[in-house]
Amino acid sequence: MVDVLAHESELLGLVKEYLDFAEFEDTLKTFLKECKIKGKPLSKSTCGSLRDPKSLKFQRDLLAAFDSGDQKVFFRLWEEHIPRPIRDGDSLAQKLEFYLHIHFAIYLLKHSAGRPDKEDLDERISYFKTFLETKGAALSQTTEFLPFYALPFVPNPMAHPSFKELFQDSWTSELKLKLEKFLALMFKASNTPKLLTLYKENGQSNKDVLQQLHQQLVEAERRSMTYLKRYNRIQADYHNLIGVTAELVDSLEATVSGKMITPEYLQSVCVRLFSNQMRQSLAHSVDFTRPGTASTMLRASLAPVKLKDVPLLPSLDYEKLKKDLILGSDRLKAFLLQALRWRLTTSHPGEQRETVLQAYISNDLLDCHSHSQRSVLQLLQSKSEVVRQYTARLINAFASLAEGRRYLAQSTKVLRMLEERLKEEDKDVITRENVLGALQKFSLRRPLQTAMIQDGLIFWLIDILKEPDCLSDYTLEYSVALLMNLCLRSAGKNMCAKVAGLVLKVLSDLLGHENHEIQPYVNGALYSILSIPSIREEARAMGMEDILRCFIKEGNAEMIRQIEFIIKQLNAEELLDGVLESDDDEDEDDEEDHDTMEADLDKDELIQPQLGELSGEKLLTTEYLGIMTNTGKARRRGTAGVQWGGPEPLRRPVTPGGHRTGYPA
């Protein structure tokens, strides 16, 4: 009761202000009469809270700082009195603030009688630069403001025709008028009764807290997925290291007979390569000096260690899933496509992931075998940018797995739709990256290589590779790798022969590109197409050997050896051994057995769930839980032997993810 009495006058003033605002005239008269009878004083300070002398003083001070060019005072007042939601979210406020920064940046140039103080001018220009690089960056794609991003770098902006208008008195007057109108509009809009403001702010505050907590939960789940994938990648790197070490040990064994190293040293190296638990027993029980023993033991150590059992993921109602993927809202489709992709990308390699993939395939999740006019695959042509992107991501995830590629390759319509999307997608970089990634992985299969060559994909690749600096690293790497895979085929080489000069120029330019990840694919493509006499002749005419020798001077040892092979191919009058082998049959010899689930599949997610929305595995198991129908383990082929050791250019199809981790194709 004491608290009520202490604030009674202010509370009654709030009620009066609201009744007046809502035009409860009779109620207000009765209320005022009763307050007077009871002797209750009304606070007068609540009414017109933003029309008080303080707000008027702020406006006067702000306009005075504008006139005097005092940018520090101006922007301090601006940030103190203009609410952040308006500064950051209102387009009118953002544009006005941009022009205000220009006003203060050029103030000394306009108002100095003589030469402006250089230190003060440099400080203002630096302040404007900082604004452009931070808050002002949001308007960098707007045509209206684009020329002003060059302003800090023009030596004499007063003489530059693009900025002539800025130095006219009318420009400053118009800007000041806009500022005055903005302040008048803002303070007029702020005459909302304080009671209503308090109510709205309290509700919004609670909502903001809940939204923030929900966002933190989503981020925590995302980090968890990232760490899981990082663990899987480290495990793959470890296996790769052991495989490489086995080759090293074979080389060391070959030198033992030459007494270059001692058997004791070889044994100590081998023991160190094994896990801690095995070192002591192996050191005494295995004779590593017997040829073949060490490398055999190392390869045997690659057998997967039995970890704790990983449970299979719950089965899903695929009929309901596919129905909602076709008929649901675009937002629901996007969340479902995301959740289905995450099932693949975050599942444990082995039985859990194989079971997920087999369930997708056996239920024809993508409708590869459907002849219906409406299918899941057609989401690749959706009007929604998010749905198109998330469909492309899911297809790329399928293509990252050998069984997934086999499933997608059964229908030529998948390839045709991807090719069409690749050539048409110009709005979304990530959609095109994922479509390109899927096609590149398709090129590991010979029938799909043939189809892509016949469809003229080589010409499209050459065209975009003419300007490699305009491409993302992913697009560049996968484009060059796809081009190389297609150039390994006779039909692909003959396609290149039709535009030999252009192909050779593009590849020679790429040799010097700063992205060194593409070098093996550029070398492989060059080596392959130079087996065609007409291309060799064109290469000699353009001085290709001199170009290649320039890169020998600055390349690493591995690249130097590859370029030497290319030069040898260039100067050959007859084809080198092995180049004439036939590649006309459509067998699957080029298909690789390993699975490469790259981290890029889940980068830069476009959608985040709002408060109360389900996403990911929670969405699938809450709304689409099915009966337990998990299929058995997929048939797995053994890991292929290493096909490429470095000295020669690549001569078998690869995919960038698999090539980097050391897996062969």
UniProtKB/Swiss-Prot annotation:
Keyword Phosphoprotein: yes
PROSITE patterns on file: LISH (PS50896)
Major location category of this protein: cytoplasm
Biased segments, Acidic residues type: 582-603
GO biological process, one term: cilium assembly
Assembly and oligomerization: Interacts with TOGARAM1, CCDC66, CEP104, CSPP1 and CEP290. Interacts with NDUFAF2.
Protein's UniProt name: LisH domain-containing protein ARMC9
Source organism of the structure: Bos taurus
Top-level taxonomy: Eukaryota, Metazoa, Chordata, Craniata, Vertebrata
